[in-house]
Structures are given as structure tokens and as C-alpha cells.
Amino acid sequence: MGRSPCCDENGLKKGPWTPEEDQKLIDYIHKHGHGSWRALPKLADLNRCGKSCRLRWTNYLRPDIKRGKFSAEEEQTILHLHSILGNKWSAIATHLQGRTDNEIKNFWNTHLKKKLIQMGIDPVTHQPRTDLFASLPQLIALANLKDLIEQTSQFSSMQGEAAQLANLQYLQRMFNSSASLTNNNGNNFSPSSILDIDQHHAMNLLNSMVSWNKDQNPAFDPVLELEANDQNQDLFPLGFIIDQPTQPLQQQKYHLNNSPSELPSQGDPLLDHVPFSLQTPLNSEDHFIDNLVKHPTDHEHEHDDNPSSWVLPSLIDNNPKTVTSSLPHNNPADASSSSSYGGCEAASFYWPDICFDESLMNVIS
């Protein structure tokens, strides 16, 4: 069924040509011409088939072959001829001097065809493509997805910058607050007694606060939190401590570790620094009942060498002299102020009326 390919013969060489083979082919054609390509290999002493010799000469060894890039005029000629002739590369090559059909075909597949597709032109019919309108929603969705991915990458980078900014603002606020506290009360105490937190400790504190807020609220943003705290500094744990009237830590330790009888008197200058928020309010029912229940009796005080630091003095003093000494106070303000610090010899004469209330005694029992 037709002629068999010449390359099927046994012993013929295939693959790239060597410079020696190229020189043999050039010398033979220059002397004798190519003649019959099927008989040329034996005459030129080449172990190749006739087709391989023809393609090698036509596409590479021919002296009139034009090398280099295609010009704009050659591109327009190829496009015009392809719209008329189609993929007939040999016919197109006859209109381009020095260009081979194989070179024109490669240039079409690698450059011109892709260029037409990008311009929205069908490379076969050379007409505008109509299938673009059918795939337009998919193209728009892909474009939107690309923009979304870019925005997500930008947002992730901004989150790292926002976290660093939050750390810096938090540390700056804490250090400024400590400096202002030192300037206002520099004569009474040192800042190390109030705030002994180094930078490493502060960073750990900030990280713990941010992680806790993220667990409670996934939408937590430390930058927005800091902006809100600028309007209300009470949200900062450190700001709450600084805004309140404070006393030195040595004085707080003195008040907490000593028994009520060892507390300084009302005129002691150490009490001037005690914040009012640390004093036990008299109108607190929970503290009042707990103190009545938990306070030991006088008999227990005789055997207790180390009374608890949080125990308040007895509401009703069993010593008649003490009760009698408290009766001359006619001013309720004086009585309440004398009982604010819980001195045993300064009990208020209002307390017995409260203690003998029947409903209150039922609760205590």
C-alpha cells in the first residue's frame, strides 16, 4: 500500500547531524546538485535516508536561508497568507524569500497564534471569537478571585504590622504612666516600689492579654482596642492602678501583715496614703455578716498569738469602759470616722443597735 519510508531500512543513522555529515552533504550538492534525494545518501557516502538529507539541506544548510527574527512586514504577510491558504507552509514560504516552511510553521505556533488568541481573534478563521461572551462570567469570577487573594495577602501582612504597633503603643503608655506617677509623687516613694516590671515582663503580659481576648472574641483587634482605651483609660489594668490614689507597697504590707491592734492611729501620716477604695465600707452587708461570723471572740484572742490580718475588731466590745467612753460622741460623723479603721477602743455607739436587730441575729445564728 504505497511506498515504505526510507528510514525503515536497517543500519541507517538517526538523530542529530554531525559537522562532518553536514560538510559531506554541502560538498556533494555544490558539485553535483541534489538530484534525486533518495539516491543522494549513497552517492554522498552518508548513512542517512533521502528525506533526512533533504530536510537538512532545505532547513539548515542552504546558503540563501535568512537568519534572525521576523520583521513586522513578514508577520503581516504570514497572517494574510495564513488566512487564505491555511496551514500550507510550503506555499507560504514561497512568498517569503530566505524563509523555510519549517521556520515559518514554528514561528506561527510559538508567536503569531498566541498573539491572535490574546487579541480575541480566532487563529483559524481570523475572526473575533464569539465564545468569549459565553465564558465571560467565569472570566469575571477568576478576576475577582485574583483580587481577593491579593487583598488577603495584604491583610495578613498588615496584621503582623498591627500587632507590632500594638506592642509598642502598650509599652509606651505603660512607661509614660510610670514616669508621670514618679513626677507627681517623687518625694514619697520610688517607682520601683509601685511598678517593678521590666520590658520582658511587659511583653509577656501583653501577649497573654491579646491571646485571651482572641479566645473570647475571635474578632479582637489590638489596634482598635488601644484606640478605644485612649477614650477611656479605665479599660487598662495598669491605668486603673495609676488613676487611683495609691500608697507605697511597704505601707500596704504593714497594714496587711499586722493585727488590728498594731495598726497606726488615725492621725498617723502613713494613713494619709491609704486609698479610700481599700477601706471596708460600713454599708456592705456581705462584709458585715462575714466579719461577724469569722471574727473570733475575746476568749479566742487570749490563746491566739498570731491573729489573722483580715479580721476586723469586735462590733460589740464586752468591756463596759470602752462602751462608756464611746457614748459622749454626739456627732454621727465622728463616730463613723472613728470606726472606719476598726480600732478596738473606738467602737461606734451605733453598732449595738444594729447587732441587737432581731432579723440580723437570726441570720447570724
From Swiss-Prot:
Q: What does this protein do?
A: Transcription factor that acts as a negative regulator of lateral root (LR) development. Required for normal auxin responses during LR development. May be part of a negative feedback loop stimulated specifically in the endodermis upon LR initiation to ensure that LRs are formed only in the correct place.
Q: Which GO terms describe its biological process?
A: cellular response to auxin stimulus; negative regulation of lateral root development
Report the DNA-binding ranges.
Answer: 37-61, 89-112
- Domain (HTH myb-type): give its ranges: 9-61, 62-116
> Organism's domain of life?
Eukaryota
The organism's lineage is:
Eukaryota, Viridiplantae, Streptophyta, Embryophyta, Tracheophyta
Null mutant phenotype: High lateral root developmental progression and enhanced lateral root density.
Q: How does it assemble?
A: Interacts with FBX5.
**Coiled coil location:** none
Where found in the cell? Nucleus; Cytoplasm
| Description of what induces expression | Induced by abscisic acid (ABA), auxin and gravity in roots.
Q: Give yes or no: UniProt keyword tRNA processing.
A: no
Q: Provide the alphabetized UniProt keywords.
A: Cytoplasm, DNA-binding, Growth regulation, Nucleus, Repeat, Transcription, Transcription regulation
Quote the CDD domains the UniProt record gives: SANT
Protein name as it appears in the record: Transcription factor MYB93
